[in-house]
């Protein structure tokens, strides 16, 4: 169990994956030993997120970047939700088990938010306006999307007016639209605020309260 806060210099490691500008993204947590004779060690958590750089010289060498405030805020919000529920107040530090699969998944989400490239949602989403009640969200909120492959979960990671970017928590089979086979977990999708539905829609268990079906 480790206590993490904004004072710890979390790092991203971008490791060249190909000569075409793609880099694999890993999280690095530096640990300094209090014993001067003990060698300091870093903890590295690999993710499935791929970053693309149009600057070929940058993509040819490993690069280390510090987490920014957006990274840390999203991480703390998602960890707090995981540990205490949706109505927990914002915190400045958390104690986490970095071997916990749920925490590792949160790290994937934060990496995707910072380095992923968003797909357009044209042809992937079904129209929900007037059929299902919209779900008011802010950054770090969970939502459901009504897709050609059923309701799928996502985390809101960017908002600009009506435009929203979500990190997918479920894969979407999109063979029917002909461009590619599927969108994977932790891919980014650009949607509209009116596309965001209550996350309970994606559980398949119950219909959210106040949901109207026509």
Task: Identify the function of each model-found stretch.
Residues 1-151, 171-185, 194-214:
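Mixed-charge, low-complexity intrinsically disordered regions
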Residues 191:
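Internal alpha/beta domain cores that form substrate/cofactor-binding pockets in large enzymes
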């Amino acid at each position: 169990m480790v206590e993490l806060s904004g004072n710890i210099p979390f790092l991203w490691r971008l490791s060249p994956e190909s000569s075409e500008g793609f880099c694999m993204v890993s999280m690095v947590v530096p640990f300094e030993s209090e014993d001067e004779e003990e060698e300091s060690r870093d903890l590295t958590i690999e993710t499935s997120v791929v970053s693309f750089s149009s600057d070929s010289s940058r993509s040819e060498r490993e690069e280390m970047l510090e987490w920014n405030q957006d990274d840390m805020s999203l991480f703390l919000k998602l960890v707090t939700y995981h540990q205490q529920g949706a109505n927990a107040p914002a915190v400045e530090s958390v104690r986490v088990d970095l071997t916990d699969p749920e925490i590792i998944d949160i790290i994937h989400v934060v990496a995707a938010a910072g380095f992923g490239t968003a797909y357009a949602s044209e042809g992937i989403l079904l129209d929900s306006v007037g059929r299902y009640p919209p779900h008011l969200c802010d950054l770090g909120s969970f939502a459901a999307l009504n897709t050609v492959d059923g309701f799928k979960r996502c985390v809101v990671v960017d908002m600009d007016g009506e435009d929203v970017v979500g990190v997918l928590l479920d894969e979407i089979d999109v063979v029917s639209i002909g461009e590619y086979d599927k969108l994977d977990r932790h891919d980014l999708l650009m949607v509209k605020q009116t596309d965001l539905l209550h996350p309970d829609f994606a559980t398949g268990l119950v219909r959210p309260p106040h949901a109207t079906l026509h």
